[in-house]
């Protein structure tokens, strides 16, 4: 199971090797994931305004859906209220404490990087290519 569905969370934890492990949501926590993230100068999270791929949209910023109660729909849980943050399984709370978390929304569909989004992500956080031709090609 690839999808993290709150109403089937136990099944997700039992069978999702990819997301469960990289989110440190399994019974055994991988300290190297947390250590690696904490070495970052900044952790930049980008979500897309018209995204239909990432559900819930909050999960682009490590938010989630709650486990629904009887007769109630699941509700969005922002990052700072999620288990991964509160229990600091990945070091996100520690990064946040030192001001290293960055949250951005780019206009458009999932991974459809507009020139403005490319400028933000690559210009501000990654760095511009050394060759001006490459920068122009990225913005084409």
What are these regions (language model features)?
Residues 1-140:
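Lipid deacylating catalytic domains
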